[in-house]
Regions:
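Beta1/beta-strand and adjacent pyrophosphate-binding region of the FAD-binding site
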Residues: 1-11
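Glycine-rich FAD pyrophosphate-binding loop
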Residues: 20-38
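Short beta-strand to alpha-helix junction loop
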Residues: 53-56, 79-81, 108-126, 232-237, ...
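Active-site substrate-recognition segment that forms the wall
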Residues: 17, 21, 68-70, 167-279
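A conserved short coil-to-beta-strand element within the FAD-binding core of flavoproteins
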Residues: 132-148
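Flavin (FAD/FMN) cofactor-binding core of flavoprotein oxidoreductases
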Residues: 239-333
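Short hydrophobic core segments
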Residues: 5-6, 156-168, 299
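Dinucleotide-binding Rossmann-like beta1-alpha1 core, especially the glycine-rich loop
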Residues: 38-104
Length: 339
């Protein structure tokens, strides 16, 4: 059996990795490696038990590949927050009404857990080398019920074609007449100088709506979500986030802002499966900006589906329809709004 993977990020390389582990001949076309030099955060503090389970699984996979650094995680929430998902998943946490220098209101709490810094660029680059990924970009072609790749004008056939190209998934599939249930959006973040006691914390503020992560010294990286696909951060974005940080920590000095492109799904979480119109096309996407947290676990399930024809906890792909890609299942904010 031969498999061809389109996409060289977390979803693509880990799907290829698990296929290779199962004895499948795999070729991969990854394009340019786009991950930042800074580590990405894996958190276990999420409202959906499915995401917590996959994050735990992904963490164990990462630990076999690189040194993982723990970091204190602080989630700021209203006192009525339901932490049942953490209890059911066995995640250790503390509930406090004060923490270091954070400024909290009377009806707010902090939930302290442990996050993990994942050197994702190093891991992905290493897997691309080990698996022989090409830096070339691939397009999809179709004849009857079979899909093939087109690379530099050359046709590449495979028994299984796996589309794992992130925000490019939908555009690539549309070229063969398939509308996938994914939509791209821009995710914004900015770099800051902050008080020393804050810089080492991974923070999710679900009252003021911002998050922050340790960046390369002496930077702190923070943001508040997403906007229209392929758009730059709005004017004054970094200053706006700095004001939110300052309300908690006293001060923050904004330096610059950047945007990236993420991909959402109708469920607000990751999706993977077989595209029913074709006999050999599979897709993994909708990682919604948290591919570093659950990507390897979802990729393992998709590889199992390709090899065995079935997989645990992998629902069928829904039909495509319009939805708000900014609704992220892993974000406590949306759970709290329903409370």
């Amino acid at each position: 059996m031969k498999a061809a993977v389109v996409g060289g990020g977390i979803a693509g390389v880990f799907t290829a990795y698990f296929l290779r582990e199962a004895g499948i001949d795999v070729v991969g076309f990854g394009g340019e490696l786009r991950y930042p030099l800074t580590s990405l955060v894996l958190t276990l503090s999420m409202p959906d038990p499915r995401d917590v389970e996959m994050a735990v699984e992904s963490l164990e996979i990462y630990r076999k590949m690189a040194a993982i650094e723990p970091v204190t995680s602080v989630d700021i929430m209203p006192t009525y927050a339901d932490l049942g998902s953490l209890r059911r998943a066995g995640v250790k946490y503390q509930i406090l009404d004060k923490f270091r220098g954070l400024r909290l209101a009377r009806d707010e709490i902090v939930v302290v857990t442990t996050d993990y810094l994942i050197p994702i660029r190093k891991i992905v680059a290493s897997l691309r080398r080990r698996l022989g990924f090409s830096d070339k970009r691939a397009a999809l072609g179709a004849k009857g019920r079979r899909v093939y790749l087109v690379v530099d004008g050359r046709r590449v056939d495979a028994d299984a074609v796996i589309l794992a190209a992130g925000a490019d998934n939908r555009e690539l599939a549309l070229r063969i007449g398939v509308d996938l249930p994914f939509r791209p959006y821009s995710c914004y973040a900015a770099a800051f100088l902050v008080p020393g006691w804050l810089r080492g914390l991974s923070i999710g503020d679900y009252v003021l709506s911002w998050y922050g992560r340790p960046g390369p010294w002496p930077l702190y990286i923070a943001g508040d979500g997403c906007g229209k696909a392929y758009s730059n951060p709005p004017r004054g974005y970094a200053s706006k986030i700095a004001r939110l940080i300052a309300r908690r920590a006293g001060w923050a000095l904004p330096l610059y802002a950047k945007s990236g492109v993420c991909e959402g799904s109708p469920t607000g979480g990751p999706l993977a499966g077989k595209v029913g119109r074709f006999d050999n096309l599979y897709v993994i996407g909708g990682l919604d900006g948290y591919g570093s947290m659950v990507g390897p676990a979802v990729a393992r399930r998709l590889a199992e589906l390709v090899v065995k024809g079935r997989a645990e906890d992998l629902p069928d792909l829904p039909d495509a329809f319009d939805f708000d890609p900014c609704v992220e299942r892993h974000d406590w904010s949306f759970s709290l709004r329903r409370s």
